């Protein structure tokens, strides 16, 4: 397996072996990121803030909707990976994959609705007929650290809203379940 870093899939010299928790057999290997890789990820994420900020809500909706469709399309493969890597029974793994697609679709729909508010200021002395307003703007870079308990579904709980709001994201999966995340 390779690591997605700075807009491309990259290999690393150092690897971490992912083992099946039931029989201890190797499932796959994943790259072990170096300090240099982390610095590259941070730099790339910060460079990505401006393009992300410029995407319309509808564009972010399309990205997240497409991600949900891809998850649904690969349900069986993803469920089997969860089973091999984490040890969940296949029925629970399938449910997790379905929930992942739903979570991505919720974020997709919210991307179209992110807006500010109009606030009447007449509750303050001298404010009279004035109105205030708020704007929702991207924060910049979001670090999405996910636990191993629901390794696929908890990633979009962090990544989905971050993308919906126009942020750049760095995802860090749990060490126990790096394949599925």
Please provide the spans of the model-predicted regions:
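Conserved small-residue-rich beta-alpha loop and adjacent elements
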Residues: 121-181
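N-terminal Rossmann-like NAD(P)+-binding subdomain of aldehyde/semialdehyde dehydrogenases
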Residues: 1-129
């Amino acid at each position: 397996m390779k690591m997605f870093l700075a807009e491309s899939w990259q290999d690393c010299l150092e690897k971490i072996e992912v083992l099946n928790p039931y029989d201890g057999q190797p499932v796959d290997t994943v790259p072990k990121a170096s300090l240099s890789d982390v610095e590259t990820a941070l730099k790339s994420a910060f460079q990505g803030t401006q393009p992300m900020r410029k995407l319309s809500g509808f564009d972010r909706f399309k990205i997240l909707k497409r991600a949900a469709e891809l998850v649904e399309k690969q349900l069986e493969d993803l469920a089997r990976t969860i089973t091999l890597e984490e040890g969940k029974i296949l029925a629970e793994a399938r449910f997790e994959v379905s929930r992942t697609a739903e979570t991505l679709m919720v974020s997709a729909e919210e991307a179209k609705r992110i807006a500010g508010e109009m606030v009447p200021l007449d509750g303050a002395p001298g404010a009279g007929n004035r109105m205030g307003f708020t704007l929702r703007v991207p924060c910049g870079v979001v670090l999405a650290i996910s636990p191993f308990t629901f390794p696929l579904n908890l990633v979009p709980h962090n990544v989905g809203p971050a993308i919906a709001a126009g942020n750049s994201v760095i995802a860090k999966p749990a060490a126990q379940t790096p394949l599925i995340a």
